Amino acid sequence: MTIKIWATSEDNSIEYMALTADYLEGALGVLRKSFYRQEAASVAVGIAKDDEAMDEIDDFVKTVAKEGVSLIALDKKTNAVCGVAFNKLQAKKTGDEASDFHRLSEICRRPPAKDLIKFMDKADKQTDLFALCEADCLLEIMFLSTLENYGNRGIATKLCEVSVRLAKTLRYDRENVKQDIDGKELDLEPIPEAVCALFTAPRSRRIGRRLNWTIAVTLGYEIFFTNGEPFSKFLPSDNRFTTVEYFII
């Protein structure tokens, strides 16, 4: 399958493309160097201080990558991954069926990994995005991150834009642009009808405003706990809440 190039930066230095097996380790490296150390919930639970916890989240991310809708930003000069959007397709559950995040939190062994996934699950459950979007499937930008030395170049914003374009291509063009990291042919369905994300810091929330996303709910960090302590205890005073946001395509 031809690798889909979704966009190129104005200075032609960065390509935005589907995640493939060749770049999986580089994409995971972005999480280790940036996301686990800087993202608010990751900081609160202390995941970067626990190698086994990072391994557990890495394993989960590898599984998510097999859904074929994750994206990377690639430095064309160095051929290195400098940004990533690990995206997950979330299908509407029926009855009392447990969410994917809930099931994962049950099998995580390391407390930081368990608490990070429980945060994601609890935040998602504070509002019914499927009802708000009148959708049976959502594309969730699960982990969005850029290497620190590539900051202030609009990479995370472009990854969000391209995630929306990918979802629109699946829904309206019926073009199967899913890219399996194992090289397998993936089914076109499920097809997302909206894109959503948890924006956990002021910088990521500015992306939501810039791209005209809708805030579904705002949640104070004092309602999320790790090792018996609220997230708010471990985060700076200028970041006291997270938002659940969406964009209907």
Please name every model-derived segment.
Residues N152-C160:
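Glycine-rich acyl-CoA binding loop
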Residues D136-I141, A167-T200:
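Conserved GNAT acetyl-CoA-binding A-motif
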Residues T2-D59, A65-L129:
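Short amphipathic alpha-helix that is part of the acyltransferase structural core
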Residues Y172, R209-L219:
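Conserved acetyl-CoA-binding loop of GNAT-fold acetyltransferases
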Residues A27, L71-A73, N87, I141-L144, ...:
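Structural signal for hydrophobic/aromatic residues that build the beta-strand cores
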Residues S42, A80-G151, N176-K184, V217-D238:
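Conserved acyl-donor/pantetheine-binding loop and adjacent beta-alpha core of acyl/acetyltransferases
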Residues G68, N239-V244:
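Short hydrophobic/aromatic beta-strand or adjacent loop that forms the aromatic wall/cage
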